[in-house]
Amino acid sequence: MAKAANIKIKLLSTADTGFFYVTSKNSRTKTDKLSFRKYDPVAKKHVEFKETKIK
């Protein structure tokens, strides 16, 4: 059985609120870490979210 191309990742807020989004990415085409500017409802503003591993 072949290894799956898509893996689940966690986007953790850089505002240190502990809030995170879970999404997936294609690990073969996107080898670098993802970084998005999304809404953090705990901080009540848009902040940068960086990719971390799901533990």
UniProtKB/Swiss-Prot annotation:
Keywords: Ribonucleoprotein, Ribosomal protein. InterPro entries: Ribosomal_bL33, Ribosomal_bL33_CS, Ribosomal_bL33_sf, Ribosomal_zn-bd. One of its GO terms (biological process) is translation. GO terms for cellular component: cytosolic large ribosomal subunit. It holds the Pfam family Ribosomal_L33. Coiled coil: none annotated. Gene3D superfamilies: Ribosomal protein L33. GO terms for molecular function: structural constituent of ribosome. SUPFAM superfamilies: Zn-binding ribosomal proteins (SSF57829). Belongs to the bacterial ribosomal protein bL33 family. This is Large ribosomal subunit protein bL33. It comes from Mesorhizobium japonicum (strain LMG 29417 / CECT 9101 / MAFF 303099) (Mesorhizobium loti (strain MAFF 303099)).
